[in-house]
Design a protein with these regions (language model features):
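Activation segment
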Residues: 68, 135-137, 194, 264, ...
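N-terminal Rossmann-like NAD(P)+-binding domain of SDR-like oxidoreductases, especially those catalyzing
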Residues: 1-190, 244, 313, 325-350
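C-terminal substrate-binding subdomain of Rossmann-fold SDR/epimerase-dehydratase oxidoreductases
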Residues: 22, 28-29, 35-36, 62, ...
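Aromatic/pi-system hotspot detector in well-structured domains
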Residues: 101, 194, 259
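The catalytic Tyr-centered alpha-helix of NAD(P)H-dependent dehydrogenases
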Residues: 152, 156-163, 193, 197-201, ...
């Protein structure tokens, strides 16, 4: 009998939340996984170590703004699939560093598409798009809070979203002009214990865990009225993979279809941890965005019908998972345990 050929995948942004979960998912599927990561003096591997997969991945140092670097990664890994998850993905930072954001989130995507066109057009390409594309879209709505799908109007309100919109259209153009199997995954917010501390959900659960243990007195946040459609990240990376297994390339929205406010996330977290939000919350204008989105709620009907994908972890369970993870980390830290983690900069943990 012939041995089944092992599929290979190249994942950019592999040290991030989505990259780590996707790598873990692909490894479980039997893939050989290559990861492109930034050339830095101390690459942050805590997520890969946390999942126990660091030694199962072949890492390739590279630069998302350098064509030669990207081409080299493709030639070296010879992938069947490429998942482009690398991004400057923090909206606030995109206002402070718009040029960096444009180069990484926009030009980097074009370089990958061009490299695929030149090296091997059989490679399947996934582009991590975002619900931020919709912004406060100027759509014809009977009410302000409508569900957004693949046909809704894009109206970005940040340099991050604008850069992602550029990438979105280039994926479509290369798909149509060069018949490359390239797709956009328009993912709404998705969280987990591996979310970065700069994101509000993880900031809430980490701060509240510290408050619960007497390590800090209050929690500072910005706009509590902001509404989002929050899902569970490990489920969303499965949707990414499913998109590249289809007979034809199409774009998909991935979302829960439920909206919740930052206040709801905060108050539920407090309830889970036995805290009172009124006693610990302090509003800080520093955490307000120059332009805030009103409400983003996704319609993933197409993904459900075509990919047979649907979210399983509900909002309350998601918050519980994150709260318990951060509380457990801080409890273990206080016991003197050393482990890969982002809240403590301890080189010995790596």
């Amino acid at each position: 009998m012939f041995n089944k050929r092992i599929k290979k995948a190249l994942v950019t942004g592999i040290t991030g939340q989505d990259g780590a979960y996707l790598a873990d998912f692909l490894i479980r599927k039997g893939y050989k996984v290559f990861g492109l990561y930034r050339r830095t003096s101390s690459p942050n591997m805590w997520r890969l170590l946390n999942l126990g997969i660091r030694d199962k991945i072949e890492l390739i140092p590279g630069d998302m703004t350098d064509m030669a670097s990207i081409s080299n990664a493709i030639i070296k890994s010879k992938p069947d699939e490429i998942y482009n998850l690398a991004a400057q993905s923090f909206v606030g930072t995109s206002f402070e560093q718009p040029l960096v954001t444009a180069h990484v989130d926009g030009i980097g995507t074009v370089m990958f598409l061009e490299a695929i066109k030149q090296i091997n057009r059989e490679i399947r390409f996934y582009q991590a798009s975002t619900s931020e594309l919709y912004g406060n879209g100027k759509v014809d709505r009977s009410v302000n809070e409508s569900y957004l799908d693949e046909h809704s109007l894009f109206w970005p309100v940040s340099p991050y979203a604008a850069s992602k919109l550029y990438s979105f259209h280039l994926v479509r153009i290369y798909r149509e002009a060069y018949k490359i199997f390239a797709v956009n995954g328009i993912l709404f917010n998705h969280e987990s214990p591996l979310r970065g501390l700069e994101f509000v959900t993880r900031k809430i659960t980490n701060d509240l865990a510290r408050i619960k243990l007497g390590l800090q007195k209050n929690m500072q946040l910005g706009n509590l009225a902001a509404k989002r459609d929050w899902g569970y990240a490990p489920e969303y990376v499965e949707a990414m993979w499913l998109m590249l297994q289809q007979p034809t390339p199409e774009d998909f929205v991935v979302a829960t279809g439920e909206k919740h406010t930052v206040r709801e996330f905060m108050e539920l977290s407090c309830e889970i941890l036995g805290l009172r939000s009124k006693e610990i919350f302090v509003q800080n204008k520093r955490f307000l965005r120059p332009l805030e989105l009103n409400c983003l709620t996704g319609d993933a009907s197409k993904a459900k019908k075509t990919l047979n994908w649907k979210p399983r972890v509900k909002f309350k369970e998601l918050v519980e998972i994150m709260c318990k993870a951060d509380l457990g980390r801080w409890q273990n830290h206080l016991k003197g345990k050393i482990f890969p983690w982002d809240a403590i900069n301890d080189p010995s943990a790596y």
